[in-house]
A protein has these predicted regions:
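Hydrophobic helical membrane-anchoring modules
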Residues: 1-8, 23, 30, 151, ...
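Short loop->beta transition adjacent to catalytic acidic/histidine clusters or analogous donor-positioning motifs
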Residues: 5-9, 29-39, 47, 60-63
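A conserved hydrophobic helix/loop-capping motif in glycosyltransferases and polysaccharide synthases
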Residues: 8-17, 24
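Acidic helix N-cap motif at the loop->helix transition within catalytic regions
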Residues: 19-23, 46-55
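A conserved acidic beta->alpha catalytic loop
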Residues: 41-50, 98
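Acceptor/aglycone-binding surface of glycosyltransferases and processive sugar-polymer synthases
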Residues: 67-85, 99-183, 187, 213-223
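Short aromatic/hydrophobic "clamp" motif used to bind/position activated sugar donors
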Residues: 91
């Protein structure tokens, strides 16, 4: 029996992911045929958008949002626009670089079906091929985020995760009420959302193996790190 996933939208923010995106989209629809998938592209200069548009002929539930003319760029603003445009009951965010395994989307769905307002993926031990500096940056950012969230009464294993899902209306309300306090040019939208969740929010999660980028280059820059640090004071 085919499982119905039509009440869920997978939102994938992209920027120059031509080497990854087709394989990722094919995997998603192979595993979850009835799910919706929205690619939110931040103005790719490669063939990312052309590939997605071609795949729309193959997958009727695939859509593309082109943000190339938007004044504010960045991963956070792409995710915010994707969530605000979502029309299904639930959404799930994954990266377009292959680091979030599509086969683990099912575990996010399971926790959402059990009543979670937000379901957050926790990265398993760091990939063995990560550089020492990358491990230090990631670990330090996570510790700082946990301390900041404790001030809001929120305890979570991996506040820097980019793999998470939630009730669409629940998160849309948070965005509409607190959007000015979000770092839209930043890199980690979940951290901003968690700072604004109500005290009785039902937070749940799942574990997943955090992969290495399959192709392309990381979007993490010094400017993004500075914006992240400044977000602690919002």
């Amino acid at each position: 029996m085919t499982i119905d996933y039509s009440y869920i939208t997978i939102i994938i923010p992209t920027l120059n992911e031509a080497e990854n995106i087709e394989r990722l989209i094919d995997s998603i629809f192979l595993l979850y045929p009835s799910i919706s998938c929205l690619i939110v592209d931040d103005g790719s200069e490669d063939e990312t958008q052309s590939i997605v548009l071609a795949l729309k002929n193959k997958y009727s539930n695939l859509d593309l949002m082109d943000r190339s003319k938007e004044p504010v760029k960045g991963l956070c603003s792409s995710v915010v626009d994707g969530i605000q445009s979502c029309r299904t009951e639930y959404f799930i965010i994954i990266d377009g670089d292959g680091q979030h395994p599509p086969e683990f989307i099912q575990y996010c769905i399971k926790t959402l079906n059990l009543g979670a307002d937000l379901s957050i993926g926790t990265r398993e031990p760091y990939a063995t091929r990560w550089t020492f500096s990358r491990i230090v940056i990631s670990y330090s950012a996570s510790i700082l985020a946990k301390i900041r969230l404790l001030l809001c009464g929120v305890t979570i294993r991996d506040p820097m995760s980019g793999f998470f899902g939630g009730k669409t209306k629940f998160v849309q309300d948070i965005l509409s009420q607190h959007k000015k306090s979000f770092t839209l040019g930043g890199y980690k939208i979940l951290f901003d959302i968690l700072k604004k969740v109500p005290k009785k929010c039902n937070l749940s999660g799942f574990y997943y193996p955090f992969g290495l980028r399959e192709c392309g280059t990381s979007k993490l820059t010094i400017k993004i790190i500075i914006r992240y640090v400044l977000s602690f004071f919002r």
